[in-house]
């Protein structure tokens, strides 16, 4: 600012400012009065007059328009040099607002204007005689029919409720013409109207409307509506400096509109707001830079506060309505605490790359509790989702856990099985305590250990049976039957009822220290029930043959059983399919895999009850043999059992008695001597 004394905005005392203004502006006082009068001339000469301030301002780049400064300072100080005319008791402005006379020249009553000119924008734009009557001033204008406002009329304007109501309606009429709407009469809050775009365009093209807005602001301050001034000025500062929607109004808003506010505190707030949003700030000439930097406004008005209210109230489907209310501003009372923290872009949630399916599923469930998310899944559905995700990411060669549907099928198959109390109790506890979708992964036995075990068992059988063809054929049949569910060298591992891994492949020989299975015994051969594992199966036993109690390993399955044989319920692994069975062969319910079928069973044969693993069936037993209920694994099908085979007692450990050893030696010798096929 070149001359801060001509503006009392930042002065401590108004009287000192007036003295300084008289001292520094003594030479230009008359010219300032003439410019003030010329600023409110008749509208017929408004357009040429509006071009002169802009050309004058362009020649004063980097400095302030002092003519506007003096004009507004004179208005704020109530025209100290103005000599009021003798009106002889005439009050034309009061008569017009009382709807007693028409405005001149060629005018109409005020009620006609307020009621019929609301949407007639062409008439409001082209008629240049009504504005001096709607918003009278104490300054004379070019329309000599419109008389200046007197102090007596000012007092009546302020005291008459009827006149105040019409004055507010006239203010709303002109706001609508400019694309603005009055939102609150009490505070003076204004905002964009629905048709603001077209009206703003007209406001940019027709610069004489800037003079009309200056007159409106001055008249509001004169006639007791000062609280309407600051919100309207704030609106234009936002539109010109922040949104840059009204470039044709920008200079007038800085030179005239801001300094039409008579309240010094509000005026300082507006100047500081303009300084904050003016670019470049170093060229701001409407206030002292040092005082603007030190100034701390009591309320921090935010230029986009009106837009936030529009977003809250406006309908989302109406772009005109959204745009019309985007520039809403607040009055002095509403500007306190109006600051708003802009919401930046929200960062996207980053999921760790090494997160497994369980962590990702938990993240999905945690994110599902938001407002726009579906309801959280039940525990059962959550576990199913986890199981499906783990199955998708599991390699195809790796066996996956049992699903809930598979466990349910197993439970249904077990309903008809006659299990022992110990196995039923153990299986029920372990199945009930295990989650359906979280079965224990099976651990396969090393291939080398399994091959060594099979070779050792085979050697035991070969030593007992010699080089007889019967033993060789029986071993071949046993290997063929055992290899059908799982190929040799790739044994199939399964799960028992209580989740313990068990071998489904048939064992070819007993462990060391356990009695081997006799073969080729002419007498009846009772088969003992299986212990932890089934005993090996005898082959070609024409007569009854007592068998010792089984040890930890299962007995191999016999073949060619002429008599019928009811099969007990299967364990976790299936029995082989029956073939060449002339007699009836009832099959027990299947557990995890189908039970093996007996082959060539012409006569009935009861089987003994199984232990933890099923006893393999003896071969070539001509007599009937009762079948007992299966344990954890199914009993393999017997074959060629001509005589009855009563079942002996079951033991988990091999028999150590001397009788069993002697009986075994006798059987081995008899089988070696007899060369029966």
UniProtKB/Swiss-Prot annotation:
Keywords: Acetylation, Cytoplasm, Growth regulation, Nucleus, Phosphoprotein, Receptor, Repeat. Residues 517-656 are annotated as: 7 X 20 AA approximate tandem repeats of [ST]-P-S-E-T-P-G-P-[SR]-P-A-G-P-[AT]-[GR]-D-E-P-A-[EK]. It is found in: Cytoplasm; Nucleus. Residues 1-29 have a biased composition (Acidic residues). Receptor for opioid growth factor (OGF), also known as Met-enkephalin. Seems to be involved in growth regulation. This is Opioid growth factor receptor. GO terms for biological process: regulation of cell growth. The keyword Repeat applies. It comes from Homo sapiens. Highly expressed in the heart and liver, moderately in skeletal muscle and kidney and to a lesser extent in brain and pancreas. Expressed in fetal tissues including liver and kidney. InterPro entries: OGF_rcpt, OGF_rcpt_rpt, OGFr. Belongs to the opioid growth factor receptor family. Sequence repeats lie at residues 517-536, 537-556, 557-576, 577-596, 597-616, 617-636, 637-656. Its main location: cytoplasm. The modification N-acetylmethionine is found at residue 1. The modification Phosphoserine is found at residues 299, 315, 349, 361, 378, 382, 403, 420, 484, 537, 557, 617, 637. One of its GO terms (molecular function) is opioid growth factor receptor activity. GO terms for cellular component: cytoplasm; membrane; nucleus. Residues 305-323, 331-345, 361-395 have a biased composition (Basic and acidic residues).
């Amino acid at each position: 600012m070149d001359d801060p004394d001509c503006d009392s905005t930042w002065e401590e005392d108004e009287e000192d400012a007036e003295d300084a203004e008289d001292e520094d502006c003594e030479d230009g006082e008359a010219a300032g009065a003439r410019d003030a009068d010329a600023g409110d001339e008749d509208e017929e000469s408004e357009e040429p007059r509006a071009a002169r301030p802009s050309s004058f301002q362009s020649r004063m780049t980097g400095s302030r328009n002092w003519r506007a400064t003096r004009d507004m300072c004179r208005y704020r100080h109530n025209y100290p040099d103005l000599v009021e005319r003798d009106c002889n008791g005439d009050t034309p402005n009061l008569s017009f607002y009382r709807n007693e006379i028409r405005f001149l020249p060629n005018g109409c009553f005020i009620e006609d204007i307020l009621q019929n000119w609301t949407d007639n924008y062409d008439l409001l734009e082209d008629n240049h005689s009504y504005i001096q009557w709607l918003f009278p001033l104490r300054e004379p204008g070019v329309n000599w029919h419109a008389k200046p406002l007197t102090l007596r009329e000012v007092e009546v304007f302020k005291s008459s409720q009827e006149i105040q109501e019409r004055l507010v309606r006239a203010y709303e009429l002109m706001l609508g013409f400019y694309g603005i709407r009055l939102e609150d009469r009490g505070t003076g809050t204004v905002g964009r109207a629905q048709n603001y775009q077209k009206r703003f365009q007209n406001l940019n093209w027709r610069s004489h409307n800037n003079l009309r807005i200056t007159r409106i602001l001055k008249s509001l301050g004169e006639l007791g509506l000062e609280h309407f001034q600051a919100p309207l000025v704030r609106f234009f500062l936002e539109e010109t400096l922040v949104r840059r929607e009204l470039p044709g109004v920008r200079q007038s808003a800085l030179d005239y509109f801001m300094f039409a506010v008579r309240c010094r505190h509000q005026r300082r707030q507006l100047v500081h707001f303009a300084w904050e949003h003016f670019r470049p700030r170093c060229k701001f000439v409407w206030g002292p830079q040092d005082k603007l930097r030190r100034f701390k406004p009591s309320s921090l008005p935010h230029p986009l506060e009106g837009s936030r209210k529009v977003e809250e109230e406006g309908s989302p489907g109406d772009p005109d309505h959204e745009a019309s209310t985007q520039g809403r501003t607040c009055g002095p009372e509403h500007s306190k605490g109006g600051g708003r923290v802009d919401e930046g872009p929200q960062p996207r949630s980053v999921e760790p790359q090494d997160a497994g399916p369980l962590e990702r599923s938990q993240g999905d469930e945690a994110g599902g509790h938001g407002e726009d998310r579906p309801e959280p899944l039940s525990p059962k559905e959550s576990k199913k989702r986890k199981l499906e995700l783990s199955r998708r990411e599991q390699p195809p060669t790796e066996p996956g856990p049992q699903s809930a549907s598979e466990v349910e099928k197993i439970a249904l198959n077990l309903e008809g099985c006659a299990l022992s109390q110990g196995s039923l109790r153990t299986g029920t506890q372990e199945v009930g305590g295990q989650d359906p979708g979280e079965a224990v992964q099976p651990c396969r036995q090393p291939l080398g250990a399994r091959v060594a075990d099979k070779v050792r068992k085979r050697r035991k059988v070969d030593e007992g049976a010699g080089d007889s063809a019967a033993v060789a054929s029986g071993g071949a049949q046993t290997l063929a039957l055992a290899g059908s569910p799982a190929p040799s060298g790739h044994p199939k591992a399964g799960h028992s009822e209580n989740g313990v891994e068990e071998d489904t492949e048939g064992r070819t020989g007993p462990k060391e220290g356990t009695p081997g299975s006799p073969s080729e015994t002419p007498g009846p051969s009772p088969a003992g029930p299986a212990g932890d594992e089934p005993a090996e199966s005898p082959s070609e036993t024409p007569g009854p043959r007592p068998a010792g109690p089984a040890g930890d390993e299962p007995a191999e399955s016999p073949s060619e059983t002429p008599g019928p044989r009811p099969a007990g319920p299967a364990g976790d692994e299936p029995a082989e399919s029956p073939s060449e069975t002339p007699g009836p062969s009832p099959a027990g319910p299947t557990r995890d895999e189908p039970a093996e079928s007996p082959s060539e069973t012409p006569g009935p044969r009861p089987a003994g009850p199984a232990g933890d693993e099923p006893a393999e069936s003896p071969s070539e037993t001509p007599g009937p043999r009762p079948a007992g209920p299966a344990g954890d694994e199914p009993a393999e099908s017997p074959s060629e059992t001509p005589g009855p085979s009563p079942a002996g007692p079951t033991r988990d450990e091999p028999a150590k008695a001397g009788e069993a050893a002697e009986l075994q030696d006798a059987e081995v010798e008899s089988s070696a001597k007899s060369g029966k096929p």
